[in-house]
Amino acid sequence: MSLKLDGKKLSLEIEERLRNYILTNKTIAKRNPGLAVIRIGEDPASGVYVGNKEKACSRVGIKSYIFHLKDTVEQKEVEQLLNKLNLDNNIDGMLLQLPISKKFDEQRLISFINPEKDVDGLNEQNIGKLVKNEQAMRSCTPAGIVNLLKSQNIKIEGKKIVVIGRSLLVGKPLSLMMLNLNATVTITHSKTINLNKICKEADILIAAAGKPNLINSSFVKEGAVIIDVGIHRLTSSDKSKTRLCGDVLLEDVIPKVFAYTPVPGGVGPMTVTMLLVNTIFSWQKQFGLSSTLNDLLP
């Protein structure tokens, strides 16, 4: 029977440890950690994601500050807000909820975030440190995947890992993290020739393509580990029902693989949990708190 990598269960376990860590250390810091989230526009999915982050913060004792701006806001106004938050000592972590309208220079806005507060790990300084394998904020989804694998003692070193997708949020930072952990990494994308053949060589296959049910059993070798980063809401043909699915046709691949992540309840919860970890990491550094935070992770 295939092993389900239960991200929801692991995230709740880590959250409990984080909550206790904050309770133990907030008397020294004299305040709880603070996370600022900037949301621009009315994208419904962004609203759900921001709400999930706010609830997770509340569960562990992080104070969340939500800044919901209208689409009519100007680039300069967002930059001014980011600069203000950089200087706010009550804010340990900051993130710009993506995606945002194409009228904004997204990368310029991210570059305005203090690297020490960049809990999404997208600032060029943090990406550069990741390339050099130096300590820095790590992108949340890739870090969540690494910890999910570690929690089940799934070996990364020496393994052939194929990543489908090259986004700045997942594919690129994840590939670098795996390389830093001594895996042999292949990055594939929409222009890759013979994708099926390349994927079938993977000991660990990570699907972050953004295409529902792209990966079936013909892409997967016997005994592989498959990580599904995708999440999509599909509507039935009569439009009466919707259901969530990932990039992987799970019912087709499960009989063939050693381990897999479900959708929902796999990578998603771990992404939010690593956001909490990054925020607390910044808080810990600011106040010189006990460095046992890493001991709370797998």
Swiss-Prot record:
Homodimer. GO terms for cellular component: cytosol. GO terms for molecular function: methenyltetrahydrofolate cyclohydrolase activity; methylenetetrahydrofolate dehydrogenase (NADP+) activity. Keywords: Amino-acid biosynthesis, Histidine biosynthesis, Hydrolase, Methionine biosynthesis, Multifunctional enzyme, NADP, One-carbon metabolism, Oxidoreductase, Purine biosynthesis. InterPro entries: Aminoacid_DH-like_N_sf, NAD(P)-bd_dom_sf, THF_DH/CycHdrlase, THF_DH/CycHdrlase_cat_dom, THF_DH/CycHdrlase_CS, THF_DH/CycHdrlase_NAD-bd_dom. It comes from the Bacteria. Transmembrane segments: none annotated. NADP(+) binds at residues 165-167, 190, 231. This is Bifunctional protein FolD.
